[in-house]
Amino acid sequence: MVSANREMAVYCFDTLVSHYNNEETPPPAFEEANHPLFVTWKKIVNGGEPRLRGCIGTLEARRLISGFKDYALTSALRDRRFPPIQAKELPSLQCTVSVLTDYEDAEDYLDWEVGKHGIIIEFTEPETNTKRSATYLPEVPAHEGWTKIEAIDSLVRKAGYNGVITEAVRRRINLTRYQSTLFSMHYSEYLSYVKATRGVVGPVINGINKHAFA
């Protein structure tokens, strides 16, 4: 089974740096495979709690190399919840790559474990018959400290449902659970990797070495 690894996170940073420089992305150092995947960018300022800056991926299997290249940029630049990440933010960024596996149909909306499973919900609004769906990666409910019901209710809101969330609404949910592996890398670790493996002090963006940025 393919697991998320350091080289995947490096490739996402390479892709973003290359975008800012309008140049070709260095070739990846991980093997090709087919899996669903996500790329998450967070920003860490003054040692504080990481703040989400973008998270987008696909629940359908696709080629990892093109997938990480596409979603590294999509999550950084086109997550509609946030303004696009700017080059000057690079030194504060943390990248997390996730590879999704082990999809299973759940018996009901409670048939999953916090901290172990990611969840996909699909349901039809009782008032309008509008179809809704949304997902949380495995680490989200655990990080938020949610119970299963709290996670489900939050995900129902994420899916766009604005009505009263009753037990009847919850029982309309078709839930798919999955597992994932993830790997997180801060920009400073990326610089160390580039220096150790390529003999380069650090990427240069628009002629400015990124060590110069605050």
Swiss-Prot record:
Domain AMMECR1: 1-194
SUPFAM superfamilies: AMMECR1-like
Top-level taxon of origin: Eukaryota
Name assigned to this protein: Uncharacterized protein At2g38710
Species: Arabidopsis thaliana (Mouse-ear cress)
